[in-house]
């Protein structure tokens, strides 16, 4: 996205020591261990060797690499072997403004530690992080540093962690008006600026979200949780439901979101409901403009949120009970084929 910022290592998970969800694979299992005790030493080597429907099973360890699952690897499952995402870490440190070896810059999407372009992908029991830090690169202007680039349909991310600073998770629809759905359950997501963003339909269900402190004084600006750029033709954008947001930042220093408006058809849709919000949220006005585009022109709403960061008033649009029945994980993800990963 437009100018933003970097990453680091945190602890935390959506559900401690949880067993991984069943994968959707029907083919082989390819094993990975960086000590050479498995068939492959790197995660990408196993992905390259995998066919559609295979499972890549990753042993405990830290893997310093970028990974890319192309569209042809439909139905691939990436699974941490222990079931605890803190044990299996895939990490890298590119930013949008990082120079590429062959010339040019990576750009926002290209900065991702992990890119999943295939449909029907399942990711479970891993940590994916981008450790690029603003403070270490004061000369870099484009500070977006993506951990996860999710750009396929019917993708599931379960019991996993996604950690960066700016633009942690990109929920992307390569064809803006087409159907791209991504489901996150029992995950942990951390960042500071626009760190859940994009134009896909994405549901964050029973996740833990950490707003990372950038050191702003009370009442200042530490950052923004979300920045959707949903196409105007789509009924649903990003939904955060039944989740917990926490932060060590000072009170009133974080916005819940702002509308990313890269083109005339991007309006931004975001609903946060039944979620615990921390004191770090700007309770009087949690939404803000972006690039001259008013948040009031987007579709931002809340419903039944709790915690010290919850509130009401003219600057906090609320769904009615009737409207809330259409803003559920099921309704967002059903699409034209009735997909229901919540079962």
Question: Would you name each region that the model predicts?
Answer:
Residues 1-31:
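N-terminal low-complexity, Pro/Thr-rich disordered segments
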Residues 26-343:
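Sequence-level preference for short, compositionally simple segments enriched
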């Amino acid at each position: 996205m437009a100018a933003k910022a970097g990453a680091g290592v945190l602890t935390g998970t959506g559900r401690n020591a949880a067993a991984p969800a069943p994968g959707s694979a029907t083919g082989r299992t390819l094993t990975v261990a960086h000590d050479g005790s498995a068939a492959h030493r790197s995660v990408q080597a196993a992905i390259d060797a995998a066919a559609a429907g295979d499972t890549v099973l990753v042993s405990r360890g830290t893997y310093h690499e970028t990974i890319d699952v192309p569209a042809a690897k439909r139905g691939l499952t990436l699974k941490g072997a222990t079931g605890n995402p803190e044990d299996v870490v895939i990490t890298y440190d590119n930013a949008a403004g990082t120079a590429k070896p062959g010339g040019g810059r990576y750009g926002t999407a290209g900065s991702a530690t992990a890119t999943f372009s295939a449909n029907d992908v399942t990711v479970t029991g891993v940590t994916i992080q981008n450790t690029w830090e603003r403070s270490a690169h004061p000369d870099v202007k484009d500070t977006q540093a993506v951990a996860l680039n999710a750009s396929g349909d019917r993708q599931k991310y379960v019991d996993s962690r996604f950690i960066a600073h700016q633009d942690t998770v990109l929920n992307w629809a390569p064809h803006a008006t087409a159907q791209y759905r991504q489901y996150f359950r029992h995950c942990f997501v951390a960042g500071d600026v626009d760190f859940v963003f994009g134009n896909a339909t994405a549901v964050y269900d029973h996740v833990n979200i950490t707003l990372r402190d950038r050191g702003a004084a009370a009442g200042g600006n530490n950052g923004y949780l979300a920045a959707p750029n949903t196409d105007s033709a789509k009924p649903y954008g990003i939904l955060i439901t039944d989740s917990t947001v926490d932060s060590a930042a000072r009170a009133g220093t974080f916005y819940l979101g702002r509308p990313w408006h890269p083109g005339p058809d991007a309006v931004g849709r975001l609903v946060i409901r039944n979620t615990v919000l921390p004191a770090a949220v700007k309770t009087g006005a949690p939404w803000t403009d972006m690039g001259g585009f008013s948040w009031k022109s987007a579709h931002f709403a809340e419903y039944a949120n709790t915690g010290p960061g919850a509130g009401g008033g003219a600057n906090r649009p609320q769904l009615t009970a009737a409207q809330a029945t259409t803003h559920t994980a099921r309704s967002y993800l059903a699409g034209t084929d009735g997909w229901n990963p919540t079962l």
